[in-house]
Curated annotation (Swiss-Prot):
UniProt-annotated catalytic positions: D62 (proton acceptor)
Gene Ontology molecular functions: uracil DNA N-glycosylase activity
Protein name: Uracil-DNA glycosylase
Biological processes per GO annotation: base-excision repair, AP site formation via deaminated base removal
The keyword Hydrolase is annotated on this UniProt entry: yes
Organism: Streptococcus sanguinis (strain SK36)
Amino acid sequence: MQHSAWHALIKEQLPEGYFAKINHFLDEVYASGTIYPPREKVFNAIQTTDLADVKVVILGQDPYHGPRQAQGLSFSVPDDIPAPPSLQNILKELADDIGVKESHDLTSWAQQGVLLLNAGLTVPAGQANAHAGLIWESFTDAIIKVVNEKSDPVVFILWGSYARKKKALISNPQHLIIESAHPSPLSAYRGFFGSKPFSRTNDFLVAKGLEPINWLA
């Protein structure tokens, strides 16, 4: 990340020495037990999607906390791992909205400019949200602020109350915010199903003269 466009702009948004603080945190937690995702994938979202290419942001809360699930991309798991319930519902809504995506690895979305960003970037095995409030929120809020400053239109997809709070960071009138209930089985029937975020995103991108996302790739 040090040599990417992300690095300098994120650094501007953070207190002096924050990157060193993150590295110290990573050294400590990865030495202390099993942490997901693998350390080399912690920054996968901004390593896979260049700032210049970002057209869509899908914000998650924290990584999956089961073995081999987390890839450093929000909601995504490798194809040899069963899709967790929220991802199953995302793919169900996609099927109803546009068509069937056979893979539940979302890397192809990230490669097309969909920033799959979790608010927290690490989690201990079996302990959802255990790293919440420790270090990541300032860093990932900085990423959202950097994307907000893009002159090109971006779609921010905010699912659930946690993600929707991030609207406060999105002030650029060029951008579109699509929000609904979370795809979790606990809330998907309260407005996530039927919200058509994928076709709405593409309609907006096309209207702005941008390439739509191939959500089925």
